[in-house]
Amino acid sequence: MSTLRILVFGIILSLTTQISAKEMIYEKLDQLFYDQVEKLQSGNLEERIQAADYLKFVSSKLAVRPLLKALKGNVNVPKSEENSPTLKFTIAQALGAMESDIAGPGMVEEFKKISANVQEGDYPAFSSPEGYNLVIAAGELIRNVGLLPYTKENQEAILNALNHPNFYVRASAADGLKNLNRKDTLSQLNSAIDKEKNSFAKVAILNAIVYINRIANQKFYDLCAFLKDESPMVRYRASIAVGEVDLKAGEYSLREALLVEHDKMVREQIKKDLASVTGFKMPANTILFTD
């Protein structure tokens, strides 16, 4: 066999080996994917939640239909683990991350179903032995509808949620409109802020308005003013909002807030958002920023 033939044979063998190795990797990934889908459909609650979380990070649109099926839960057994708000929360995030247009109708339908059971006085439970409550799940659904490709139906569903009796659902609807990022929703957002009484929801609505406009106008300074609110939860949310819109004008308000903020969780969030606005990581040992 000539040297040239040996060289060609070696190249072909090398390429074949590489292709074979890649095929094996793809097969393993496919098997892992289907294992997670199986757990999503028939595992215990913890396995279902972990599977939905895994599928969120894989972000494969192959998972959209299995996730939508799991989102519906078990309509015949209301207290079934399949209807867990924590599971619905995680599935909503996964579907939002996949940004598939076919997810919209199912997510909107499920939001309408569960939000009908959320009352005006219900409070979002971020941590409890049972996990998240229905308020959190409803909010996460409508928030993530805003991440999907635009449709008139999706936008109308989010706008309608802006009038929900519960403040957290209204705030989540504002987040959904922020995610949708369409200037034609500004009139409804401006109308909503004029009649909103709840400070947390006000911050979310202002956040959406400023995010869409990207202008340091009066609405932006109204948002910054909530960094002085009596409620730590509102101050925390306001800090996230100011950091998220990423306008340099927010630096002064965040620095002023940090000088007087005593709540540890809020302080840490302000530090993160200030670093985001100023474009660098603040030293942990700087006297001004120590607890």
Which sequence ranges carry the predicted segments?
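Bacterial N-terminal signal peptides that target proteins for export
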Residues: 1-7
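Hydrophobic alpha-helical transmembrane segments of integral membrane proteins
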Residues: 3, 44-45
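Sec/Tat signal peptide C-region and signal peptidase I cleavage site
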Residues: 17-21
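Amphipathic alpha-helical scaffolding segments comprising HEAT/armadillo-like alpha-solenoid repeats
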Residues: 26-38, 60-77, 100-123, 148-161, ...
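Short inter-helical turns and helix N-cap capping residues of alpha-solenoid HEAT/ARM repeat scaffolds
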Residues: 43-44, 75, 84, 115, ...
